[in-house]
C-alpha cells in the first residue's frame, strides 16, 4: 500500500483516482473532476450523527454511526469500496478533513483484506490548495484577454491555443443569454476546482502566459473568481474580427443546429426538439426588456416561425431572420459601445488566422 499522502500537487497533476467518502449532499456542493462518491454515511445518517455530536459529544456520535451503518448496509458499502480499490490500485480515499470518516473507511477496508491509502487533510486541504493555486496563477502569470463581437469565433481560437483558459468550456455554457447547453452547469465550487486544476497542469508544462475570453463576471450560473475577473479588466486585449455573414452562420451552427442535436441526444427526438425550442424562445424572452416590446415581439415571431418550419421540414434557413435582427439591432451596437471603451487596451485586431498567429508569437516571446 502507498503511504497516506498530502502531496496534493502530484494527486491533481497525475489525475490520481480518488474515492470521496463524504455524504452525497456534501459531494454535490463541490468535488473534483473524475472523483467517485462512495460515502460512509448517507445524508440522513450524517445528519443524525451530526445532531448527536452537538448534543452528546464525539463518543456518542461515533457509537450512533456504528449503529446506523451495520449489517447489510455496512457490507454493501464495504463491497463498493473494495471494488473501487481493486479497480484503482493507485488511488486514494478521503473525507472532509481526513479525519474519522476516512480513517473508518480505511480500517473497514483493511478488515476486508484491502490496504488503501487516504489523503491527509481530506477535501478541505485539497480545496485550499486549489484556491491557493488559482491565486498564485492570477498574481504571477501574464493574461491576455480575447475580445470581439458576438460569434466571431473566440472559442475556436481558444481551442487552438495550448495556453488558453476556456472559461465557457469549464462552465459548460456559451456565455451569452443564449448560452445554456442541453446538459447542466457544474456547481460553483466544481467550476473553480476545474479551473484551478487546468491552471496547475498548464503551469507545470511551462506555460506562464494565458489567453482568456472577455467574459462578464457570470458565465451562466458560474461566477468567474473575483480576483481573476478584476485582473482581466486591466489586461491587454486582442480583438477578433469576422464578417457579419460568417457570424450569422456560426450562430446558426452553434445555437440552432448543434444545440438542437444536443437536446435530441440527451432527451430523444420528440422531447428533445420541444425542449430545444422552449430554450431558444426563453433565451430571447430573457432579454425582452433590453430589446423593447416591439422588437422582442417581431424577433419572437420570426423565431417561432423558424422553429415550426424546422420541425416540419428539417430546414433551418428561416432562423437566419431572427439571428440577423438580433445581431444587427442588439448585440452589435452593444459590443461596439464596449469596444470604444476598451480601445486603449487593444494591442492587436484581426481575423482568426492573424489573431492566432499574433497570440502564438506573443506567447513564444514570453
From Swiss-Prot:
Its EC number is 2.9.1.3. InterPro entries: Rhodanese-like_dom (IPR001763), Rhodanese-like_dom_sf (IPR036873), SelU (IPR017582). Disulfide bonds: none annotated. This is tRNA 2-selenouridine synthase. The active site is at 95 (s-selanylcysteine intermediate). Belongs to the SelU family. GO terms for molecular function: transferase activity, transferring alkyl or aryl (other than methyl) groups; tRNA 2-selenouridine synthase activity. It comes from Pseudomonas savastanoi pv. phaseolicola (strain 1448A / Race 6). It comes from the Bacteria. Keywords: Selenium, Transferase. It catalyses: 5-methylaminomethyl-2-thiouridine(34) in tRNA + selenophosphate + (2E)-geranyl diphosphate + H2O + H(+) = 5-methylaminomethyl-2-selenouridine(34) in tRNA + (2E)-thiogeraniol + phosphate + diphosphate; 5-methylaminomethyl-2-thiouridine(34) in tRNA + (2E)-geranyl diphosphate = 5-methylaminomethyl-S-(2E)-geranyl-thiouridine(34) in tRNA + diphosphate; 5-methylaminomethyl-S-(2E)-geranyl-thiouridine(34) in tRNA + selenophosphate + H(+) = 5-methylaminomethyl-2-(Se-phospho)selenouridine(34) in tRNA + (2E)-thiogeraniol; 5-methylaminomethyl-2-(Se-phospho)selenouridine(34) in tRNA + H2O = 5-methylaminomethyl-2-selenouridine(34) in tRNA + phosphate. Involved in the post-transcriptional modification of the uridine at the wobble position (U34) of tRNA(Lys), tRNA(Glu) and tRNA(Gln). Catalyzes the conversion of 2-thiouridine (S2U-RNA) to 2-selenouridine (Se2U-RNA). Acts in a two-step process involving geranylation of 2-thiouridine (S2U) to S-geranyl-2-thiouridine (geS2U) and subsequent selenation of the latter derivative to 2-selenouridine (Se2U) in the tRNA chain. One of its GO terms (biological process) is tRNA wobble uridine modification. Residues 12-135 form the Rhodanese domain. Monomer. It is an enzyme of class 2 (transferase). The keyword Transferase applies.
